[in-house]
């Protein structure tokens, strides 16, 4: 329907398909609407790949916050932070390639590094998960290395890395020390701070070891 409304000049359909992996029908509808608006503002009859790529980012992360004035030192910090993510993710194996880096604020984020998968992953290897954790912490590492200080900008990265590490140990059984056991199956309170009075099928010593 939307392709009938506007001619779409998409030379790299495979790249677009990778960038919209996991999108729902509503997401795709929103994507094409946003791309059509961008083309319309230029009085163009065709939607370009650039329009679609910008629309993908907007659907994922929200609109740009042009009204927000960012101090120069914060823009610099954000640039190094996002570059840190990109360098680590580009260097380590078994990770999705870097697609775009931006320091334009969107939603709650001051910037972001966007990755596009080469393929759909049904299973995640231990190498992929460990390297993903390293990539999440790459922004904090870049701040420390280049600026000599760290900021609260990595708080979401640290939270995601911690959750991923805990899943590797408690859900996926990927810890050499703990073995191939799913400790948190139905008992995730040890990881998310619920009451310790709830029944757990393992000892306090095991819980401490997992932490």
Label each region the model flagged.
Residues 76-79, 86-211:
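Soluble catalytic regions of large protease machineries
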């Amino acid at each position: 329907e939307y392709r009938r409304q506007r001619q779409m000049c998409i030379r790299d359909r495979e790249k677009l398909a990778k960038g919209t992996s996991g999108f729902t029908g509503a997401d795709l509808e929103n994507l094409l609407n946003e791309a059509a608006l961008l083309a319309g503002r230029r009085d163009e009859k065709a939607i370009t790949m650039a329009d679609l790529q910008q629309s993908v980012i907007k659907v994922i992360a929200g609109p740009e916050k042009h009204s927000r004035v960012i101090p120069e030192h914060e823009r610099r910090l954000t640039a190094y932070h996002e570059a840190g993510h990109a360098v680590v993710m580009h260097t380590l194996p078994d990770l999705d390639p870097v697609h775009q880096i931006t320091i334009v604020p969107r939603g709650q984020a001051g910037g972001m590094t966007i990755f596009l998968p080469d393929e759909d992953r049904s299973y995640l290897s231990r190498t992929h998960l460990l390297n993903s954790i390293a990539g999440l912490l790459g922004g904090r590492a870049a701040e420390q290395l280049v600026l000599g200080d760290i900021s609260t900008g990595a708080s979401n990265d640290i939270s995601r890395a911690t959750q991923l590490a805990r899943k590797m140990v408690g859900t996926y059984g990927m810890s050499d020390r703990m073995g191939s056991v799913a400790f948190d199956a139905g008992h995730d309170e040890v990881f998310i701070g619920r009451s310790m009075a709830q029944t757990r099928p393992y000892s306090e010593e095991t819980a401490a070891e997992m932490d």
